[in-house]
Amino acid sequence: MGGTLWTDMNKFDPLTLHSVRDMMNDYRATVNDQAGYRRLKPADTVERHRQTIDYFKLILDQNKDKKCVVVGHHSPSHQSCHEMYKSDYLMNGAYHSDLSEMILDRPQIKLWTHGHTHHCFDYMIGETRIVCNPRGYANHEDTGWDPEKVVEVC
């Protein structure tokens, strides 16, 4: 199953919500046609995060006896934050959420893959493998991208 899975902005932190609005292109240029053509606000994406999490939990809880794969755009863990960005708490809230508890409570999730970051990650949270293998911007960065990466779900 999958969804965009916007982040929770550091657990809905007011300072993060305010700061990312001015720092991210998503909130300067994007319009939300559902609300009458206006700029997208961090509060909008936090609400979409909540909706996606509710959907994920519903589907996962209905399928406890099946192996599941989750695909989301934004990262489910701060473990997917590259070392050079770890000190930027506010901006990291716009890229990563801490969904470790949700993942640990649902061991049927065998693989969770995501994007939104420009560096590769492959690690475990409990019984769940978290994988991100982005190419990044062509000719601009060394992301660790593996064009032949295959992930086997057991």
Report each predicted region and the residues it spans:
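Hydrophobic/aromatic beta-strand patches that form the interior of the parallel beta-sheet core
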Residues: 1, 69, 111-113, 131
